[in-house]
């Protein structure tokens, strides 16, 4: 109890005009040059085809494309799940949802979050002497000890969950459109079933709500400012740092940008991509001007585009899941089709990561945890097993193919949440359950069980259009190995130290800075 009180007390101490916990940035610089810094940037609902370096039709990612030319681009990189909370939990633990307990999204009223017996990447690096910060969306529990300040992050600035989970006065663009927060004593204007609640979206700095509702139009620039301030302060101190930037882009609602250089004539989605790219460019520029030689920057996404948002959703590129679209529904976010989990990914570290390299290694967001831990000269937590692996050899251009096998869990489209219903085995992909998420036209594909899995050869069929013939030699050669690797991982999980998330809901835990005001309004700090 005393430790908890101390953490709460320290989290509110102010330095240089913005809140920081009482982190000793001024410890001796003896670690400088010995341990690398890490900046991990995670986009939200960004499609594989939204990166210009991946897909020539995209023209709005100049900074990311430049990063690709200055580093390594991964074209077979996968989120660990196809929706928000499970993907983020796997990034921070290196473990699938069946191990870490997070198999579906947390709500505004969620009592729990990422189970407290799971060790986060931030906690490991904090113990190794790192200063740790998160800027952006958390979505792994906001109540009590689930808050990021108690999960290894010294500094937090951001929103506790997706920005469509609370109203704002700057609602931006959504499909269907959503109203602004109610004003004064007026009745609720939230009549759309798909729109957020009338409780305003909060913006946190550490444990304090500093703005409710948050201004979505200026949020990206605030993130850029806080991220660059954190990098400057940490680099000046001589201590190594971990900065995790979890962007609001490209999740809906798309903001009305306030950046003065915003281009005209682009689509709403293209303008959002441009703003996101500008934000990433500001962070990279700060790294380049302060800690370039000793900082590893990793950019990727949490899952594929949210197709039901129609023109406000991104591009899956060539990964169109054509077999599923013929059945109905979307093969993107929430599904185990390639469009749901194959995401853009870039690595940048001058002098360490080779320049202008395209890697076809099979990699995953799960690999971030063990790779960063290894590069930080830290140790993996004991008493548990990990699904990610250290991929340093791939990053540094040495010979290593990455994973031979990946497992894709159900993220809401079909089957039981978290169930490993799809197996990637080298070039092959086997589906034991298929189903589409809600598409722009409102359709959802039927949930279909496949005792004999559908198997696609992704090298020949990136669109996942035509499965192998069940009686053919190629299918018969692959099937036994698919069955074996799936049985092996399920047995491994059964023998592991696994966790269970608390998905209990209670309206009293809803973040609210002023319960006496409609929509929980309070003044911005």
Swiss-Prot record:
PTM comment for this protein?
A: N-glycosylated. N-glycosylated with both high mannose and complex type sugars. The conversion to 3-oxoalanine (also known as C-formylglycine, FGly), of a serine or cysteine residue in prokaryotes and of a cysteine residue in eukaryotes, is critical for catalytic activity.
Signal sequence extent: 1-16
Q: What are the required cofactors?
A: Ca(2+)
User: Impact of altering residue 501 to P?
Assistant: Decrease of sulfatase activity
Q: Name one Pfam family in it.
A: Sulfatase
Q: Which residues are glycosylated?
A: 117, 215, 356, 497
Q: What is this protein called?
A: Arylsulfatase G
Origin organism of this chain? Homo sapiens (Human)
State the gene name recorded for this protein: ARSG
């Amino acid at each position: 109890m005393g430790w908890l009180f101390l953490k709460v007390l320290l989290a509110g101490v102010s330095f240089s005009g913005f809140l920081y916990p009482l982190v000793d940035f001024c410890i001796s610089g003896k670690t400088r040059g010995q341990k690398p810094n890490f900046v991990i940037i995670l986009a939200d609902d960004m499609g594989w085809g939204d990166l210009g370096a991946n897909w020539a039709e995209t023209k709005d990612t100049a900074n990311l494309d430049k990063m690709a030319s200055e580093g390594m681009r991964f074209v077979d990189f996968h989120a660990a799940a196809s929706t928000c909370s499970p993907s983020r939990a796997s990034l921070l633990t290196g473990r699938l949802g069946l191990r870490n307990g997070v198999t579906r999204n947390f709500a505004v009223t969620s009592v729990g979050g990422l189970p407290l017996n799971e060790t986060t990447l931030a906690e490991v690096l904090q113990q190794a002497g790192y200063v740790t910060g998160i800027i952006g969306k958390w979505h792994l529990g906001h109540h009590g000890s689930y808050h990021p300040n108690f999960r290894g992050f010294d500094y937090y600035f951001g929103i506790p969950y997706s920005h469509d989970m609370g109203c704002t006065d700057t609602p931006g663009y959504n499909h269907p459109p959503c109203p602004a927060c109610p004003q004064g004593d007026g009745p609720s204007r939230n009549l759309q079933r798909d729109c957020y609640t009338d409780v305003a979206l909060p913006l946190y700095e550490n444990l304090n709500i500093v703005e409710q509702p948050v201004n979505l139009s200026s949020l990206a620039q605030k993130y850029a400012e806080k991220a660059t301030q954190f990098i400057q302060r940490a680099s000046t101190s001589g201590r190594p740092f971990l900065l995790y930037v979890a962007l609001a882009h490209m999740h809906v609602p798309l903001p009305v940008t306030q950046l003065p250089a915003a281009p005209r004539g682009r689509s709403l989605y293209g303008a959002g991509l441009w703003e996101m790219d500008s934000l990433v460019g500001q962070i990279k520029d700060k790294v380049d001007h302060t800690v370039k030689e000793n900082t590893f920057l990793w950019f990727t996404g949490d899952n594929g585009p949210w197709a039901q948002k129609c023109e406000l959703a991104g591009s899956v590129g060539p990964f169109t899941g054509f077999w599923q679209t013929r059945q109905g529904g979307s093969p993107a976010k929430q599904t185990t089709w390639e469009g749901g989990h194959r995401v853009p990914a870039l690595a940048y570290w001058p002098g360490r990561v080779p320049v202008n390299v395209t890697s076809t290694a099979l990699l995953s967001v799960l690999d971030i945890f063990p790779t960063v831990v290894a590069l930080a000269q830290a140790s993996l937590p004991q008493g548990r097993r990990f699904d990610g692996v250290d991929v340093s050899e791939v990053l540094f251009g040495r010979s290593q193919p990455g994973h031979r096998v990946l497992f894709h869990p159900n993220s809401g489209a079909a089957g039981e949440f978290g169930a490993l219903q799809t197996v990637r085995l080298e070039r092959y992909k086997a589906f034991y359950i298929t189903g589409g998420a809600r598409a722009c036209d409102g359709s959802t594909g039927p949930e279909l069980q496949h005792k004999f899995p559908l198997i696609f050869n992704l090298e020949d069929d990136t669109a996942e259009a035509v499965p192998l013939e069940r009686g053919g030699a190629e299918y018969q050669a692959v099937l036994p190995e698919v069955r074996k690797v799936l049985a092996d991982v399920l047995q491994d999980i059964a023998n592991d130290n696994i966790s269970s998330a608390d998905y209990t809901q209670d309206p009293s835990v809803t973040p609210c800075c002023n319960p006496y005001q409609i929509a929980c309004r309070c003044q911005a700090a």
